[in-house]
Amino acid sequence: MARMVHCVKLNKEAEGLDFPPLPGELGKKLWQSVSKEAWAGWLKHQTMLINENRLNMADSRARQYLLKQTEKYFFGDGADEAAGYVPPPSA
């Protein structure tokens, strides 16, 4: 049976993550209160941030930026949006 959590992003009961997605306290907090559906939404948003801002993931500043954005996305006032980003048309 799937582990259920009250998702902080979707504000509903949903299937929880199978394991903490990140190390440390933030990973534990995400595992306890974020659903698979919301995490999939974050991965899409994270990809957009990496691509549109041309982040180099070998750069520790880029990784720290994404960690802060992860926390803002789920527990704050929302993550940054890329200026001028237009989502691709739905198929």
From Swiss-Prot:
SUPFAM superfamilies: YggX-like. It holds the Pfam family Iron_traffic. One of its GO terms (molecular function) is iron ion binding. One of its GO terms (biological process) is cellular response to oxidative stress. Keywords: Iron. InterPro entries: Fe_traffick_prot_YggX (IPR007457), Fe_traffick_prot_YggX_sf (IPR036766). Signal peptide: none annotated. GO terms for cellular component: cytosol. Could be a mediator in iron transactions between iron acquisition and iron-requiring processes, such as synthesis and/or repair of Fe-S clusters in biosynthetic enzymes. NCBIfam families: PRK05408.1. PANTHER family: FE(2+)-TRAFFICKING PROTEIN-RELATED. HAMAP family: Fe_traffic_YggX. Belongs to the Fe(2+)-trafficking protein family. This is Probable Fe(2+)-trafficking protein.
